[in-house]
């Protein structure tokens, strides 16, 4: 297999050169940021010959007639550009770098990344930051901002299917395969130079993935010299953001420096009990030795602490008439204290050596080291009542007696020690344990604690990317990369809540097997261990992984055709290394486990037929395999080394076709796409009532289909007024009956497998319909106004596999076959979330203070109509009532968006 792939790669290198022709070539970039402008139309006015700029901004016209002509360049969002040119026979004339001036009178790099990017713990967000010069695709601009409110995912893909690089170095994490936007820390000015490869498009910096590829450039010499500062107010998860950036530009000694800092703060966010504290630093230093060699250093980090909210039941939202109710906090000493606090810090350093021996060859080699610290706190308890206020036994609906229902409803409405976490009661329970220990001499530890669940990573990455222009219309692009990663997972004690210690045993095993001393031990190497603040307990293991890949592609730009084709191959290995000998799996938990190895490959091709200078049709296709992420490969990694049986690589088949047009006043793209994914894995954990223990559940062999249509249109009514329309109608569905594996953490039963009936159910967590209609006005006096109406629909709750297994006992509670059918439909029903309409508005003013200084004022008002019923996501619980098969005992849980949201930014540049 590897030999065949190498031979294919070698064949791609042996592409014959073609005859020289007559024409022009050049590069189109944004005049302010220097970012390449992709999709700009370049025409020779007197001949009608044309070309479209590629992802790196380059273009070439090769069938021109010698003589004098005028080069015209136009692209949506930019002023038209023209210049006289003299074309020489049998020569491709280089017109150099064409700098287009943006028609946007505001700097949208000042706006924050969407909260779905910054704060999505599950890593499902795949929206794209709207950064200057990133893309002129109207649909992708709408998806990046307008649709993000309901956690819209482009084409339905999870973020692991989008590859993100910084200066060409891959930054997707090893465990979940995603790029973590929160590591950027809101440093929008520092990370504003972004190139986007949409879908299956070819890019110059990586092979990409089915969800596309993004590259963020942070080379110090590319930042405009000067200082930029801004302060912003918002009523979201934080209310204050300050940011300052200074760039020296490239001085006469070949040095360039850019530094940036930002803070985000809130002692009380829009969600009760939440807070947000983040400080960010960025440094980019570059030395240009000569036109051929330069060295760049980029370093950044953003230590962040934030209090999170938790999804809960619709019943509680309705009782309190508050869809932002948060069960994760309670009062302590007159202050709000949140039990779910996330702490994250991802310090990163990247070094790049750029070698450009001539104008046809460039080699970018980068090394990155990053250390990711991530933890989330949670309550834990031992032989005591559940302290969470939204525990199902505390709901009025749990009781049948109406008087009891009314009593619980009254307590929810009037008593915050009941409707929120009662911290005083938790401390009191532990104080009583201390008192009893003093009186009786019997050892008694904490009944309640606050624990911290850690998932850290140390990543070292190496990337090298080659761009070689073989001739005026053919470019060879290739790259190699390797990543070495160690992921560490463990728990520590954050707070004993007044108690003396915590006993490190499994309480479920102790309850079910009190006489089996071995079974209840979390670490047989340190049995019955008493742990205190900051001690590790419960579980402790590493996963060491290596990922290496090589890719190569050819890009051919002809007068009427743009063609690209490429191959990639990769090698993945990972291995669990347990630091505790767990009593439920004493022979398969401690030390290094089985090594899992995967060889994978992929091939993709694309072609664009340019009907004329303004209309084109493009198509892309991809087939490849991808190693399963180790975050989903292990069944119960906290307990043992067991992975999914017959673990296989994922297979992906994808294609799309687009019609593109780019007239001076009318611009747009219509795309149809289709993707099949085979052998996917999914993993979830929950408390299982049937066996009264914590359950790990893995789905394997999952097949999903993603298909739909995307439309993005922009019409310029006048030079200053533009109407935008964007939308998608899609279907994301499960297409088979995968295998489910249950693993019981108390060791009560061996792992079991069963068929899970998911075929034709929807992939949850994202709208499958989304539409926007907006108008932009760049008004006189450097004012701008924008109004957008957004409608999103067809979003479904995420499925729980236990509701889609065979239930042999179901017939016992059904008296007739008709009742059995109805009950089955009720259990397996997938709820559709609310459809929603949102109106967003923005206004801004740009004021030039003098020739070098300007003041920028922007006000965004999202959800102008104050719609408070927007369900951003929801999920079926893993817990299920196997006694009465009642769906109301453990109903779905939901997250809601806030109502009206303001974002006021004032920035100055000098």
Positions of PLM-derived features:
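Short acidic/polar hinge/loop motifs at secondary-structure boundaries
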Residues: 138-142, 169-200, 216-223, 325
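Short strand-turn segments of transmembrane beta-barrel domains in outer membranes
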Residues: 196-203, 212-249, 261-272, 788
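Acidic/polar loop-and-plug regions of large Gram-negative outer-membrane beta-barrel proteins
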Residues: 286, 294-352, 375-451, 515-533, ...
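Surface-exposed extracellular loop regions of Gram-negative outer-membrane beta-barrel proteins
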Residues: 305-307, 311-316, 520-521, 525-530, ...
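Outer-membrane beta-barrel signature, preferentially recognizing the C-terminal barrel domain
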Residues: 324-348, 352, 543, 593-602, ...
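Signature of Gram-negative outer-membrane beta-barrel scaffolds
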Residues: 449, 475-612, 637, 739
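Gram-negative outer-membrane beta-barrel transporters
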Residues: 674-676, 697-802, 907
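C-terminal beta-signal and adjacent terminal beta-strands/loops
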Residues: 677, 723, 791-814, 845-910
């Amino acid at each position: 297999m590897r030999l065949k792939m190498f031979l294919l790669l070698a064949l791609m290198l042996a592409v014959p050169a073609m005859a020289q022709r007559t024409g022009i070539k050049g590069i189109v970039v944004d005049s302010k940021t220097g970012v390449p402008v992709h999709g700009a139309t370049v025409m020779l006015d007197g001949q009608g010959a044309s070309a479209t700029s590629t992802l790196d901004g380059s273009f070439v016209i090769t069938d021109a007639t010698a003589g004098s002509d005028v080069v015209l360049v136009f692209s949506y969002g930019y002023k038209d550009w023209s210049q006289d040119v003299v074309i020489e026979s049998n020569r491709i004339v280089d017109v150099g770098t064409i700098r287009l001036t943006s028609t946007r009178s505001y700097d949208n790099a000042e706006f924050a990344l969407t909260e779905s990017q910054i704060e999505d713990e599950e890593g499902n967000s795949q929206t794209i930051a709207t950064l200057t010069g990133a893309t002129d695709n109207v649909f992708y601009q709408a998806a990046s901002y307008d649709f993000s409110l309901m956690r819209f995912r482009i084409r339905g893909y999870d973020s692991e299917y989008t590859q993100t690089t910084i200066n060409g170095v891959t930054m997707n994490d090893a465990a979940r395969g995603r790029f973590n936007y929160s590591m950027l820390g809101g440093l929008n000015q520092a990370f504003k130079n972004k190139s986007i490869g949409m879908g299956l498009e070819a890019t110059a910096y990586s092979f990409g993935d089915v969800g596309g590829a993004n590259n963020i450039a942070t080379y110090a010499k590319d930042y405009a010299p000067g200082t930029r500062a801004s302060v912003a107010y918002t009523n979201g998860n934080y209310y204050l953001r300050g940011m300052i950036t200074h760039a020296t530009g490239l001085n006469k000694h070949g040095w360039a420096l850019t530094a940036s800092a930002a803070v985000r703060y809130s002692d009380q966010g829009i969600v009760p009990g939440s807070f947000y504290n983040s400080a960010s630093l960025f440094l980019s230093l570059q030395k240009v030795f000569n036109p051929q060699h330069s060295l760049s250093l980029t370093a950044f980090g953003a230590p962040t602490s934030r209090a999170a909210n938790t999804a809960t039941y619709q019943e509680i939202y309705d009782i309190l008439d508050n869809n932002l109710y948060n069960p994760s906090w309670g009062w302590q000493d007159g202050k709000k204290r949140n039990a779910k606090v996330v702490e994250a810090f991802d310090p990163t350093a990247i070094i790049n050596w750029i070698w450009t021996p001539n104008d046809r060859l460039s080699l970018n080699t980068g090394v990155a080291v990053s250390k990711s610290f991530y933890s989330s706190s949670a309550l834990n308890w031992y032989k005591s009542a559940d302290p969470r206020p939204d525990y199902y036994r505390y709901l009025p609906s749990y009781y049948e007696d109406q008087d009891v229902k009314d009593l619980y409803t009254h307590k929810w409405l009037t008593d915050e020690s009941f409707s929120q976490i009662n911290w005083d009661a938790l401390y009191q329970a532990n104080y009583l344990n201390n008192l009893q220990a003093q009186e009786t001499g019997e050892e008694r530890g904490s009944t309640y604690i606050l624990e911290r669940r850690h998932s850290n990573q140390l990543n070292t990455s190496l990337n090298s990317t080659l761009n070689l222009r073989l001739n005026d219309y053919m470019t060879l692009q290739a790259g190699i990369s390797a990543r070495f990663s160690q992921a560490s997972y463990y728990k520590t004690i954050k707070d004993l809540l007044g108690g003396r210690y915590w006993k490190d045993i499994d309480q479920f095993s102790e309850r079910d097997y009190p006489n089996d001393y071995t079974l209840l031990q979390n670490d047989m190497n340190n049995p019955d261990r008493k742990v205190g603040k900051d001690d590790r307990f419960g579980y402790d293991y590493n996963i060491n992984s290596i990922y290496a890949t090589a890719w190569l592609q050819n890009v051919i730009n002809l007068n009427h055709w743009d063609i690209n084709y490429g191959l990639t191959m990769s090698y993945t290995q990972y291995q669990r290394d347990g630091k505790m000998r767990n009593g439920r799996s004493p022979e398969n938990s401690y030390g290094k486990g089985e090594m899992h190895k995967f060889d994978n490959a992929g091939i993709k091709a694309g072609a664009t037929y340019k009907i004329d200078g303004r209309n084109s049709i493009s198509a892309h296709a991809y087939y490849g395999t991808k190693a399963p992420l180790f975050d989903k490969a292990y069944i119960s990694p906290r307990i043992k080394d067991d992975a999914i049986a017959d673990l296989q690589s994922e297979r992906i088949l994808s294609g799309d076709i687009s019609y593109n047009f780019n007239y001076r006043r009318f611009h747009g793209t219509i795309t149809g796409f289709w993707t099949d994914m085979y052998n996917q894995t999914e993993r979830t954990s929950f408390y299982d009532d049937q066996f009264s223990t914590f359950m790990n559940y893995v789905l394997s062999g999952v097949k999903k289909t993603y298909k739909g249509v995307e439309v993005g249109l922009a019409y310029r009514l006048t030079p200053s007024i533009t109407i935008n329309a964007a939308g998608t109608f899609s279907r994301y569905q499960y297409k088979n009956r995968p295998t489910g594996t249950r693993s019981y953490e108390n060791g009560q039963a061996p792992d079991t497998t069963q068929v899970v009936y998911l075929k034709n159910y929807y992939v949850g967590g994202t709208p499958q319909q989304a539409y926007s209609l907006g108008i932009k006005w760049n008004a006189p006096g450097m004012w701008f106004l924008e109004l957008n109406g957004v409608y999103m629909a067809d979003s479904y709750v995420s499925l729980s596999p236990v509701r889609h297994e065979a239930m042999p006992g179901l017939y016992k509670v059904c008296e007739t076959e008709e009742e059995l059918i109805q009950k089955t439909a009720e259990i397996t029903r997938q709820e559709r979330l609310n459809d929603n309409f949102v109106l967003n508005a923005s206004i801004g003013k740009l004021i030039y203070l003098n020739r070098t200084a300007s003041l920028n004022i922007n006000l965004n008002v999202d959800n102008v109509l104050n719609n408070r019923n927007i369900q951003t996501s929801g999920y079926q619980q893993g817990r299920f009532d196997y006694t009465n098969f009642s769906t109301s005992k453990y109903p779905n849980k939901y997250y809601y968006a806030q109502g009206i949201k303001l974002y006021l930014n004032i920035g100055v540049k000098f």
